[in-house]
Regions:
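Active-site-adjacent alpha-helix immediately C-terminal to a catalytic or transition-state-stabilizing loop
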Residues: 60, 96-128
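Active-site-proximal alpha-helix that buttresses catalytic centers in soluble enzyme cores
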Residues: 2-3, 7-82, 125-127
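Short phosphate-binding loop-to-helix
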Residues: 83-100
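Active-site micro-motifs of SAM-dependent methyltransferase domains
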Residues: 12, 85, 114
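Hydrophobic packing residues within well-ordered alpha-helices of enzyme cores
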Residues: 62-66, 91, 117-118
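Surface-exposed beta-strand edges and their flanking turn/coil or helix-capping segments
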Residues: 19, 92-94, 108
Length: 128
């Protein structure tokens, strides 16, 4: 069975002056959160074999902390600019395009696209 893990970037700081939103970094709270989530994934014993991610600074910084904590070794993310500010439909396209050969695909990006993707993939109730 194929597995999809959806990881939003860690908490970012609005107090840092950057010219573009794309360049906004994570903050200290975000760094702690990225490490904790990585440790959680490691405990689940679900080996990730493919990562696709937005190349935005806050995503790259999140993965720099998350990956060692999750013990993902030298797995290199596939950076896909389409993920930045993507709709759920675009995210589905990215997953189809780059996740075909993965058994456990991790996608890392941004809201509202990731949240909309989850709402599209998960039924409203267990009865559905």
């Amino acid at each position: 069975m194929k597995t999809l893990t959806i990881l939003r970037h860690a908490k970012s700081g609005w107090d840092v002056q950057v010219e573009r939103d794309f360049d906004r970094p994570i903050n200290k709270r975000g760094a702690r959160g990225a490490e904790l989530i990585g440790q959680w994934l490691k405990r689940q014993k679900l080996p990730v074999d493919r990562i696709i991610a937005s190349p935005a600074v806050r995503v790259t910084e999140t993965l720099d902390i998350f990956q060692p904590a999750a013990d993902l070794g030298t797995l290199e993310p596939h950076w896909d600019r389409r993920i930045y500010l993507a709709s759920s439909a675009t995210l589905i396209d990215v997953i189809r395009d780059t996740g075909k050969n993965a058994e456990h695909l991790l996608i890392s990006g941004h809201n509202p696209g990731l949240e909309d993707l989850i709402l599209m993939l998960v039924p409203e109730s267990a009865d559905d």
